[in-house]
Amino acid sequence: MAKSTTVYKNILVIEDNHAILDVITLILQSEAYKVTGLNKSADMLSNIRESEPHLVILDIMLPDADGRELLKQLRSDPTTAHIPVLLISARYTEENVEHGEFKPNGFLAKPFDIDDLLDRIEGILSGKTY
């Protein structure tokens, strides 16, 4: 579980399924994370520049974009390349996600266990790659 601290970490969650987005948001807020949720990618870059997240949780299959292309966009921009990204997907598995040269910091297949999500987030925020 995430440790309580006085330094709140900002997490941007981009997930098109409203129920999943709401659950992730509530769980992370209960663990003292500051969470911004988007259900499409259109506002991603402006939101990143505004909120400066410590982590982006990014669904691969969005109605308006492919999360892998968004990852490539983030990694290609010097102002966002340093931001850790956790990819999530119901369709893909860790073995069949094509990362190419732009690798995420982690991947979780949906449905995922809440403790696995929190452990993965905590690990990524402490510098680990999965």
Identify the residue ranges that each predicted region occupies:
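Two-component/phosphorelay signaling modules centered on CheY-like receiver
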Residues: 18-36
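Active-site residues of response regulator receiver
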Residues: 59
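Acidic, metal-coordinating helix/loop segments flanking the phosphotransfer/catalytic sites
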Residues: 37-55
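Conserved acidic carboxylate
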Residues: 15
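The feature encodes the CheY-like receiver
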Residues: 63, 81
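Non-catalytic signal-transmission and effector/linker regions of two-component phosphorelay proteins
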Residues: 1-12, 115-130
